[in-house]
Each structure stands twice: as structure tokens, then as C-alpha cells.
UniProtKB/Swiss-Prot annotation:
Component of the Mediator complex, a coactivator involved in the regulated transcription of nearly all RNA polymerase II-dependent genes. Mediator functions as a bridge to convey information from gene-specific regulatory proteins to the basal RNA polymerase II transcription machinery. Mediator is recruited to promoters by direct interactions with regulatory proteins and serves as a scaffold for the assembly of a functional preinitiation complex with RNA polymerase II and the general transcription factors. This is Mediator of RNA polymerase II transcription subunit 9. The gene is med9. Component of the Mediator complex. One of its GO terms (cellular component) is mediator complex.
């Protein structure tokens, strides 16, 4: 199957995906950190710079974005006790489904075709 392009080993795409995932994670971590902004504000204050107001506005908008993000999280409207009950219910469902899956596997109703 010649496509005119170079053939890469099968491992390369996975490595590229891992690198992309790490880059996205780093980007997301930066979105949730406030320390660099606070540091910039302190530096501006030390220099008596007029950029302090801009930095403060950036910090304020970041806090607002985080409040919105937290407000939209699933389960935020439930108490910790309700969350624990819900978690326990989900664990029981997983346990039941795992047991059923093992039961169905042991029935040997599914034949694996021989090639």
C-alpha cells in the first residue's frame, strides 16, 4: 500500500499523542494557577507601574472564570453526604455489572471464531 509518504513506525503516533496530551495538561494547569498573576501584580507594585490595574483586572476575570467553572461542576449542588451516597450507589452498580459480566463470560455462549 504505497501512499507516496514516508512510513513511520507504529510507536511514533502514540508518542506524539502523549506529547500533545502533556501539552494540553500543562496548558490547563496554567489556566488554574493564580500565582503567576499575583507575582506580576507584586512586581508592578514594586515598580510603581500603571500596569497594576491591568494585572488586577486579569486576576479578577480569572477568579470569575473559575467561579463559573466550579459552579458548573457536576454534583456541586449536592451535599457531601449526598455525594457519598451517590458514589456508593455507583460503586454498587459497577460491582453488579462486573459480576454479571463474569457470569456471562462463564456461560460460554459466545464462541470465538477460529482463524
Amino acid at each position: 500500500m504505497a501512499t507516496g509518504g514516508t512510513v513511520r513506525p507504529a510507536e511514533e503516533p502514540e508518542e506524539e499523542e502523549e506529547e500533545e496530551d502533556e501539552a494540553v495538561e500543562e496548558e490547563e494547569e496554567e489556566d488554574y494557577t493564580f500565582l503567576p498573576l499575583v507575582h506580576d501584580i507584586i512586581k508592578c507594585m514594586d515598580k510603581d507601574s500603571q500596569d497594576v490595574y491591568q494585572e488586577l483586572n486579569e486576576l479578577k476575570s480569572k477568579f470569575q472564570a473559575m467561579r463559573k467553572l466550579v459552579g458548573n461542576m457536576p454534583g456541586i449542588d449536592m451535599s457531601p453526604e449526598e455525594q457519598q451516597r451517590h458514589l456508593q450507589s455507583l460503586r454498587e452498580q459497577v460491582q453488579t455489572k462486573s459480576e454479571l459480566l463474569q457470569k456471562y463470560k462463564s456461560l460460554c455462549m459466545f464462541e470465538i471464531p477460529k482463524e
